[in-house]
Every structure is written in C-alpha cells, then in structure tokens.
C-alpha cells in the first residue's frame, strides 16, 4: 500500500535524518512507480515468451518458487537445468496476471504470494504448451498448504504436478531425475494424443444450516487436548451436537499420514 508506506517513511526519515516530508513523499512515489513498472515489465516479458512458444511450437515450464528462489545459491541452477532440455522457463509472476482463480478454494487464500501462485497454476492448466514445477525449500510449513492447492488445481484438469524439494545442499541429482521423468511423461502423452478436460478448481462447501442443528453432529479436530476438552461442553451448551475427535491412537495417525501433507506444521494448519 503506497499510502501506508509513504507515511511510515515520512515518520522515519523526518525524525532520524530531518529530511522534509515533501521530499520523502516524492521519493516514495517515484520508488512505488518503479516497482509497478518492474512488474509490468515482467508480465510483458512473460507474454513475449508465450508468443514465442506458440510461434515455434516449443514448450515452457513455469518455475514457481518463493522470492528467495531467484537466488542461485538456493535454486542451485535448476532454471538452467530445465532450459538445457529445450524448455523455456517462466516465473509465476510473469503469467499470473493471465490466470483467474476459481473460488472458493479449499485453503484460506490470504497471502499475496499464494494468490499469485494459484493464479499462475490456473493459467497453466488452460495451456497445452505449459507445465508447472514448484520449488520448496527449508521444509516451509506454509508451502505444505500451497503445494496441495496447486496440485489440486493442476491435476483436476489433467496436468502433471511436480514439486522439487531443495535445500542448502548443492546436489541436482534428484531434481534432474524428477525433471527428466516429467519430460518423459509429457512425451508419452503426446505420442498417445492424450486429451485433457479443463475443469473448475472451485471447492463447493456444505453449508451448515439451522435445520441441521437438531440431527447433525459436528466433528471437531483435536488441536489442543487442554483447550478443546473445554470447547466441547461449551458448544453443546448452545444446543449443538459435537464430538471432538481423539487422535492419540494408531488409526488416527494412519489416517493423518494418508490425507495430511507430511510437511504441514502446526502454524500452517
């Protein structure tokens, strides 16, 4: 938000460096305009590459990562590895403006990066000459949310979803195998004239109505034994049927391993 940023900069520079407020506002506006222009340049370059792909009949990979993945010390040359196989590489922010996310999503979409990522995936699923590879580093718990959602957007429409888990170790062996496997799968699909059907990724929630209050039981996940043992009788006092699910047994662990992303940490849930 340019207004909030400008106010913060005026307060900081006026107090610490005695710089006139008008000068700070002018500089902040110029910087903000440059930021917006850089984004427009990125989008224009993305459209340019997409046009080139159509003209040449080539394929492209949207390499989706967090902002720190532009650092060569973190991505370990994966973009160059992909281009060595004859694919063009695009970032998610170069194509996200072309995609429209069908809502609501399964996840809570409240972060700008996540929204951009879902928009990029929504665009990729409509393009036959594009696929997406998502980078994941440091076991980020929030990426456990994004990887599941991006996978859902792509696979529902018949796209192959690939995530590369990379860390500080400079070893491209596993990444190379995953990328070559993706390329091989795409070639097999082309040979077999595989046809996809693009479908909506919107999630249709069942709404709990007043009529359900009498006959339906609310199932509550056990997130904290101390607190949730108090929540159950509190909600029942309002006339709801509720059962807090117990998770201190082997079957609960097995179900969790089957349906929950192994990288999901408590804050991400």
Predicted feature residues:
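An N-terminal assembly and electron-transfer interface module characteristic of large anaerobic redox
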Residues: 1-269
């Amino acid at each position: 938000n340019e207004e909030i940023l400008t106010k913060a900069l005026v307060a900081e520079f006026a107090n610490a460096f005695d710089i006139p407020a008008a000068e700070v506002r002018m500089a902040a506006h110029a910087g903000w305009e440059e930021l917006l222009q850089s984004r427009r340049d990125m989008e224009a370059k993305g459209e340019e590459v997409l046009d080139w792909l159509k003209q040449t009949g080539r394929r492209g990979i949207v390499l989706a990562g967090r902002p720190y993945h532009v650092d060569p010390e973190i991505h370990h040359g994966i973009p160059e590895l992909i281009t060595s196989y004859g694919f063009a590489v695009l970032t998610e922010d170069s194509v996200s403006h072309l995609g429209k996310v069908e809502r609501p999503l399964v996840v809570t979409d409240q972060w700008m990066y996540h929204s951009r990522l879902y928009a990029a995936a929504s665009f990729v699923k409509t393009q036959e000459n594009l696929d997406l590879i998502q980078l994941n580093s440091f076991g980020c718990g929030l990426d456990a949310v994004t990887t599941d959602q991006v996978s859902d957007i792509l696979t529902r429409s018949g796209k192959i979803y690939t995530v590369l888990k990379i860390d500080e170790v400079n070893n491209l062996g596993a990444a190379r195998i995953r990328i070559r496997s993706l390329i091989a799968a795409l070639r097999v699909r082309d040979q077999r004239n595989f046809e996809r059907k693009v479908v909506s990724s919107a999630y249709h929630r069942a709404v709990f109505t007043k009529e359900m209050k009498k006959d339906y039981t609310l199932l509550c996940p056990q997130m904290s034994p101390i607190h949730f043992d108090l929540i159950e009788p509190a909600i029942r006092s309002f006339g709801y049927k509720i059962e807090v699910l117990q998770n201190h047994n082997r079957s609960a662990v097995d179900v969790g391993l089957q349906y929950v992303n192994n990288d999901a940490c408590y804050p991400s849930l």
